[in-house]
């Protein structure tokens, strides 16, 4: 068990560290006993740069393009978690708990799509592409860049709604100080030509660079569907 302080309300929160919902290289995801709609992301080794970056993110959240549908398109930090050992260091944050969604690769892979969601048609793929573009546009409007665009960070529902996760890996630009907190990672297949063979930790991403991964993420599932259609009809 670990006790951490939840800001800005200054309440102490007890997290059970023996059972995690997921584990990554930098952090683990845990349930929040007092709220089933939230999860806590706790860093293995908190860094000072994360403190400032998360504070900027909390102060300047993007718009939610599917708020009218009661859906969360971007799993954004909602509250910061601080250590109670007197250091006041940020150890993680709370964010919405996302349920009933799968990685986008399960939908643009025909075999897994038939297995998990057999009624997910071509029209749903088009709707997924549109919703993904809307989520990216909402981030870009606030100056954020996803950076690490990959299939694991894009979740899709059975009704083609999209949620972006791992948002603390995004490139963040402080609108007040103009400091840029870069995204040091990325997948080659979603990296635009001008950033290939570059050290991401040394590069400021720009919104225009994400026309490439956005197009890739939108049209890969569509053309995979069409290629299967063409193989079965062009005989």
Model-identified regions with their sequence ranges:
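Catalytic-loop of the protein kinase fold
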Residues: 136, 140-157
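Conserved structural core of kinase catalytic domains
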Residues: 72-127
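ATP-binding glycine-rich phosphate-binding loop
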Residues: 2-49, 71-72
């Amino acid at each position: 068990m670990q006790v951490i302080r939840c800001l800005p309300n200054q309440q102490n929160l007890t997290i059970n560290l023996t059972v995690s919902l997921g584990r990554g290289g930098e952090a683990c995801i845990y349930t929040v006993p007092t709220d089933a709609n939230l999860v806590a992301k706790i860093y293995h080794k908190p860094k000072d740069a994360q403190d400032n970056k998360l504070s900027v993110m909390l102060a300047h959240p993007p718009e939610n393009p599917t708020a009218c549908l009661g859906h969360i398109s971007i799993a954004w930090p909602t509250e910061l978690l601080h250590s109670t050992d007197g250091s006041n260091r940020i150890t993680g944050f709370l964010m919405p708990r996302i349920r009933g969604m799968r990685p986008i690769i399960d939908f643009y892979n025909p075999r897994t799509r038939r297995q998990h969601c057999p009624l997910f048609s071509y029209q749903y793929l088009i709707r997924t592409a549109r919703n993904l573009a809307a989520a990216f546009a909402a981030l870009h409007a606030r100056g954020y860049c996803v950076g690490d665009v990959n299939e694991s960070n894009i979740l899709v529902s059975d009704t083609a709604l999209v949620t972006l996760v791992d948002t603390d890996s995004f490139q963040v630009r402080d609108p007040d100080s103009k400091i840029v907190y870069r995204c040091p990672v990325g997948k080659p297949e979603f990296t635009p030509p001008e950033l290939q063979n570059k050290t991401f930790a040394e590069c400021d991403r720009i919104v225009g660079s994400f026309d490439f991964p956005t197009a890739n993420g939108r049209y890969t599932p569509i053309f995979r569907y069409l290629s299967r259609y063409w193989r079965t009809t062009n005989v």
